Amino acid sequence: MNIYRTHLCNELREEHINQEVILSGWVYRKRDHGKIIFVDLRDHYGITQLVFNEADNEIFQLISYLKLESVITIKGTVVARDSSTINTTVSTGLIEVVVNHVTIESEANLLPMNIASTQEYPEDIRFKYRFLDLRRDKVKHNIILRSKVIAELRKSMENMGFIEIQTPILTSSSPEGARDYLVPSRIHHGKFYALPQAPQLFKQILMVSGFDKYFQIAPCFRDEDARADRSPGEFYQLDMEMSFVTQEDVFNVIEPVLLNIFSKFSSKTIHKEFPRISYHNAMLYYGSDKPDLRNPLIIQDVTEIFRDSQFNIFNSNIKKGMVVRAIPAPKTANNPRSFFDNKIEFAKTLGAQGLGYITFNDDSSAKGPIAKFLDEERLNKIKSICNLQTGDSVFFVSETEDKAAEFAGEIRTILGTELNLIEPDTFRFCWVVDFPYFKYDKKEKSIGFFHNPFSMPQGGLEALNNQDPLSILAYQYDIVCNGIEISSGAIRNHKLDIMYKAFSIAGYTQEMVDKKFNSLTRAFKFGAPPHGGIAPGIDRMVMLLADATNIREVICFPLNQSGEDLLMGAPSEIDTEHLKLLSLNITKKS
């Protein structure tokens, strides 16, 4: 028999009444009723109410002074609760255990946070005492949810014939674009390993090696700043790659996997469609390459309506090559002036010059700072293209195309939120496809890759030879859910002539490519199959499923926003002898 417990703290029921039991756990709550002390004993599985009677003075005194979160083992008799104390919110709510023996396994110090409270504590306290924070129901449930999601993902991949393969953690610097975490070599002085930003090259080499379907729950390391949906340091993704597939094949594999996960672990409404939105249309109609389809507002381009109009500010901008975007605001025509002024001020905080607007009032008249500069024909065109009704308003932003998209997208988001237009308790997915292959860097005055340099350009070598590089699209794709990018992938470029040409446009010689990506180019010289893949982010998926607003809520031991591990004290200084062993010298910043 287990000396610490005969039952778990969620197991005892009416059928156990009069049985002698042994339980172990943490002292969760204490209620002193004078001659009786009630204790809620908690373990990983649940809670059982314990009863300590004054008649057993030694035990009674012991428990009366014991601090919360101390660990105890008790022996006692299961009895039925009085009808007035029955608790239907817990599985053991019909019984309690009258204690006749207690062993203190470990006594707790005074707590820096109340485990039983729903009070929000500062992150520095929570992360420093993460072992306490993880005892709280909400955090614990998030971690358990994460475990179940990963188990289900593995099951799905194995059922589809994927093989799980672990790729190296110590590798060379990768091309993903973020900063690497570097590890100095003790043996090879002056040389460094890098922690992988993603298993990109390894999984492609696995396809060249003849494996048909690969996956792993892959740790990825990027020296990036924290955001609400991005943890600094490391994250995990369901990394997968397949040989002899098209973009459609990848879509057909991953969509059922995600739908299964979201259906299994959430009670929210799940829209099973994955509409496909080109990158161009995402930026035009949603002002973001991560469109939140729960928001029904659609941005429209109204540049041509304002061209040669009497509104000189926009007309002048258009002549300089700028655009005008319209963001509808339903049923706001009668809102107070402060509503519109607040949006203008918000736009200015984003860096916009300002924000125009028109209201279409109940008397069918158009009002606002811009309305008087537009004739009836132009006003009607705006109403038509923006699908406006009487009582609606519309905001306008005029900037360069990229800034107009950004500002309009932010206005769309804040309007959707303030006007309660966001569809509640639902998940809406979409694909963003047809990303540009190249981009122009105004600062460097050069062409570079827009995203993944190893993706296949649409049109192949012919497009690279004959098209304007900035017009070429890539076989790259993202999955977005509720405005959060949860996955990114691509059909890979498996042909060396196309790869060399693509890199040459981005300023790399063949020798530079061979040196930087030697493992991949060598492998491609020995027969490379067409291949592609995708990598849904596990942290972000669990964040959505847990309805958390911050990704750190679903990571067991997260870094804080400054990239510090307050529990373990990392990063930390290294002693001089260790630095000498690695041939390193630290130069203090002045």
Curated annotation (Swiss-Prot):
It comes from the Bacteria. It catalyses: tRNA(Asx) + L-aspartate + ATP = L-aspartyl-tRNA(Asx) + AMP + diphosphate. It is found in: Cytoplasm. It is an enzyme of class 6 (ligase). Keywords: Aminoacyl-tRNA synthetase, ATP-binding, Cytoplasm, Ligase, Nucleotide-binding, Protein biosynthesis. Residues 200-203 are annotated as: Aspartate. L-aspartate binds at residues 176, 222, 451, 492. One of its GO terms (biological process) is aspartyl-tRNA aminoacylation. Homodimer. Aspartyl-tRNA synthetase with relaxed tRNA specificity since it is able to aspartylate not only its cognate tRNA(Asp) but also tRNA(Asn). Reaction proceeds in two steps: L-aspartate is first activated by ATP to form Asp-AMP and then transferred to the acceptor end of tRNA(Asp/Asn). Belongs to the class-II aminoacyl-tRNA synthetase family. Type 1 subfamily. This is Aspartate--tRNA(Asp/Asn) ligase.
